[in-house]
Amino acid sequence: MKSSMRSRLEQLSHRLIEVDALLAEPDTAADMERFRKLSRERAELEPVVQAFAQFARTEDDLATAQEMLADPDMKAMAEDEIKTGRERLEKLESELQVLLLPRDPNDGRSLFLEIRAGTGGDESALFSGDLLRMYSRYAEQRGWRVELMSESPSELGGYKEVIARIDGDGAYGRLKFESGAHRVQRVPATEAQGRIHTSACTVAVMPEADAMSDIVINPADLRIDTFRASGAGGQHINKTDSAVRITHLPTGLVVECQDDRSQHRNKDKAMQVLAARLKDRELRERQSKEAAERKSLVGSGDRSERIRTYNFPQGRVTDHRINLTLYKLQQIMEGDLEELTGALIAEHQAEQLAALGDDV
């Protein structure tokens, strides 16, 4: 292991001791914002420090085995232990390299999921509903909470547009590479000739903005309109102006929320979504610049990029960014996304390691 890497790991080990001491102080418990930040930092430090401790123990075991070589009776066993120990050290060092990669500060956050029907009309809207169900199932499997923020239903089912909040530790880190165009190939229920149709939806995954510090929204930059909420097909579902439309004048971003009977709650939801969209806008500009510099395949943040195809007749899902094809479409549509998300994260980490080169 390089001395620079060892030095960094030792610093992190000392920092974990400091954080534990700070968390034990009564003043920290009284300040919830500080307590949350320190708890989040501890959760990030602990796996790195544990892996480094394991590495140090393996080094000690290897040194002991080297000493045993001098004893003829122990030589054969020592050689086996040295071989195993070296392999273990190599594996642990690779794991530590990944753990030391620059972390996306948003990875631990909850997220807003926005799905929009694209080309394909009614079939695209139906697929929007399928995608929402897929992500909701995945979230449930991981113990995350899903809350519908805004929906524009289609008359035949599904959604023209739907926004959901997925609340859970690390939700954004697992799903951030889902942003992009998702294409579906299947025979629609309304197709009498049995022909395969192709349609598409756009998915946007946005980290939840920290209300305290991430995004500052000037009230003077907002136009807030209220109107009567309506259901699918345009029928009015209540008698009061509970629906809220917020326009952010400098950017032209518009957010509508009408799912709640309370105008106040609809406004709160709309402001949350607007803050997430503004944060996402900043993120995408930065990601686009970074991706251009390092020719990144995975984390470009380009929403127009076709990232995945769901081919129902063949039962396959293909992610075009990493050339991964899985013949388990039904399981994936039921929320079994772990293999896909894991492969995308691994590819992104490989890109980061390649970009850092000798620095790690």
From Swiss-Prot:
PROSITE patterns: RF_PROK_I (PS00745). It is found in: Cytoplasm. Methylated by PrmC. Methylation increases the termination efficiency of RF1. GO terms for molecular function: translation release factor activity, codon specific. Signal peptide: none annotated. The modification N5-methylglutamine is found at Q235. Residues 284-303 are annotated as: Disordered. Disulfide bonds: none annotated. GO terms for cellular component: cytoplasm. Keywords: Cytoplasm, Methylation, Protein biosynthesis. SMART domains: PCRF. Belongs to the prokaryotic/mitochondrial release factor family. PANTHER family: LD18447P. Peptide chain release factor 1 directs the termination of translation in response to the peptide chain termination codons UAG and UAA. This is Peptide chain release factor 1.
